[in-house]
Structures are given as C-alpha cells and as structure tokens.
Amino acid sequence: MRITISGLPGSGTTSLTYHLAEMHRLDVISAGEVFRQMARERGLTLAEFGSFCEEDPSVDKLIDERQREIALSNTHIIAEGRLSGWMIQEADLKIWLKASLECRVRRIFDRDQFSDLTAAMQATKEREACEALRYQQYYDIDIGSLSPYHLVLDTEMWTVEQLAIIVSSAIQTLQKSE
C-alpha cells in the first residue's frame, strides 16, 4: 500500500504519518523533514531556506524526485510532503489534511519555538506564499487544488488517534477491494 499525506504547514501531516506508519508497519519518506534538515544545515530559517530554493530550483526538485523514486520502489510506504499527492500519482490512497491558518500557526509556534504568535504568523504566511509560487513555477501546480486527493480530513476536528482510525478504515476498505 502506497499512501501520500499532504497539507499546509502545521496541518498535522508529520504527526499522522508517523502514527500510521507505526500502526501499519509502513516506511516513511518525509519531504518536510528533509527540507527542515537542509535549512538547519545551512543555518537558515524555513522562510530563508524557502527563498534560497526560489533561487535554486534544484533543491526542491531533488527532494521531490527522491521521494518519488523511493515511493515507487517500495510498496509499503507513506510519503509525507506538500506535493506528495501530486508527485506520486500511483499512490493507492492520497490524503490532504486541512486546518485553519490560526490553528496551524499555533501548532507551528509550539513546534518551532517562535518568540511570539505574530512572528509565527508572519513566517508561516511568507513560507506558504513562497512555496505556492515555487510549485506554480516549477510544476504548474496550484497547491490549493485538491483534485489529486481521495480523502480530505480536517485536523481541527479530530485528534491524531481519531484521524488514524479514519485513515485505517480507508486502508482496510482498499485492501478488501484488491
């Protein structure tokens, strides 16, 4: 089973991905973790690294191509990343997670230890605008389009455990139909 989990920053993609991976013994490829690690290695914030990626498209493309290669060579995997649902068209189940900007900013504030919510809001808006522009320029993808996704879940409505139950039900249904 190949699964993709996508969503905007702070929507809960990483939390759900690792929860499901443990439940279903699936390998994980996380574009966001790779992106954050590359930013840290360069001593840049996510917004700064996003701007750097605007200047050097090879970084984004490298992450996306590597994720696709690994996903296609493995049949028991969850690919987590903003574009995973677009890039891994062969996935059995493509999920988009959504949450309000305010909710996502609170999560990002807690996760990334911003000095205040205003700074987290500003950084999140800058990052999202930068990413949307890059995806449109590089791949002609409108990140706001949900067209490739089979399942859209609101992460403000349910806990990660409840979301995992919903997704597990979809996985079981797909496995029965194979």
From Swiss-Prot:
Q: Which family does it belong to?
A: Belongs to the cytidylate kinase family. Type 2 subfamily.
- Subcellular location(s) of the protein: Cytoplasm
NCBIfam families given for it?
Answer: cyt_kin_arch (TIGR02173)
Q: Which reaction does it catalyse?
A: CMP + ATP = CDP + ADP; dCMP + ATP = dCDP + ADP
Protein's recorded name: Cytidylate kinase
**InterPro entries, sorted:** Cyt_kin_arch, Cytidylate_kinase_dom, P-loop_NTPase
Q: What is the lineage of its organism?
A: Archaea, Methanobacteriati, Methanobacteriota, Stenosarchaea group, Methanomicrobia
**Species in which this protein is naturally found:** Methanospirillum hungatei JF-1 (strain ATCC 27890 / DSM 864 / NBRC 100397 / JF-1)
The enzyme's first-digit EC class, named in words, is: transferase
The residues that hold ATP are G7, L8, P9, G10, S11, G12, T13, T14, S15
